[in-house]
Amino acid sequence: RDDVESRGLGDVYKRQDKYRTLKVRTNADTPEDAKRAKELGAEGIGLCRTEHMFFEGDRIKAMREMILSKDEEGRRHALDKLLPMQRGDFEGIFEAMDGLGVTIRLLDPPLHEFVPTEEADIEALAKAQGKTVDQIKAIINGLHEFNPMMGHRGCRLAVTYPEIAKMQTKAVIRAALNVSKAHPDWNLVPEIMIPLV
């Protein structure tokens, strides 16, 4: 907000608001981004990319645990760790937008984007997973694709691993319900986008 005001754009935006007929939404992937966007006049979020939420601390560890799991039970165990983190992010985003529309896109990129590439990180992951470095490298190599844009991602990922989409959908709906209970005057309707259909 200070940037906008210091550059004299605040008055420009206010004048434009008198004449425009379009609503302006923003891209925001964190509660902080959403809050800043709202302060700058955004009237909702047009795209919240959930994959950006997975790259921090314990989240990336749980995401990698899910990717490296050999069966659905292992994936569900890792996803159970991610569920409260995702729900908390969505609650923060809904709160920041004060009941305005929020479109949340379910996981889109291929899984290889979440695995480490540096040798030290691969070694640490192998140790944490109780696997050898060669086993981890084999899994990572198996995830890489010739053309990731047309490969195993988006809705195709959700078909192969429906538990991922289920966890994210559950997180969105629970967050919306929790925020709606706290703000019964808001007409909070979460918008869920299925990627790359």
Predicted regions mapped to residue ranges:
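Single conserved hydrophobic/aromatic residue that forms the stacking wall/gate
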Residues: 2-13
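Conserved alpha/beta-domain cores
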Residues: 14-197
